Amino acid sequence: MLTVTQDMMLPTAITGSYPRPLWFDLSLNGRSFKSALGESLFREQYLDAVAAIINAQEAAGLDIVTDGDSRFDLAVGGKSWFFYPIERIDGIEGHRDTSRGWMSRHDLRPGKILWEVQEAYQPGIVKRKLERGPLEYTAIWQVAQRMTDRPVKFGAICAPALASMLWNEFYKED
């Protein structure tokens, strides 16, 4: 009989982003999260969306809840998952259109979801030394944690995936 996990709790949670309510139609559009919370319509929609998402998870009996990545803008194919930090890290300027080459190599055409995603994803250009920017992850987490007694987890893109969405014009390649 397996006894290694006999007394270990396996807490339940969701993975990935939660669908955005249709009435939540405002976005950060590159703004600071804290600044956006100062705008009454964004604040109301954001807080209502996070409360609804947390309540749904609690009603489902999940042990660890999430804000559903509600900070992300309405964008094609989850673009905001990459671009939330790209828009805020110092040293990144503008965008480079790499879509045509990528799409022709993979025989993609309009109407296919990967065409739409690739056309929307324009890598940010690293023009100078990358420096810390105002990601405000603590403030985003605190908003959600105030709405529940359960632990709140928080998702963010990992560094290797983020690097894959940047066009380097500053650092020497290895």
Model feature map: region roles:
Residues M1-D174:
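Domain-level signal for soluble alpha/beta catalytic cores
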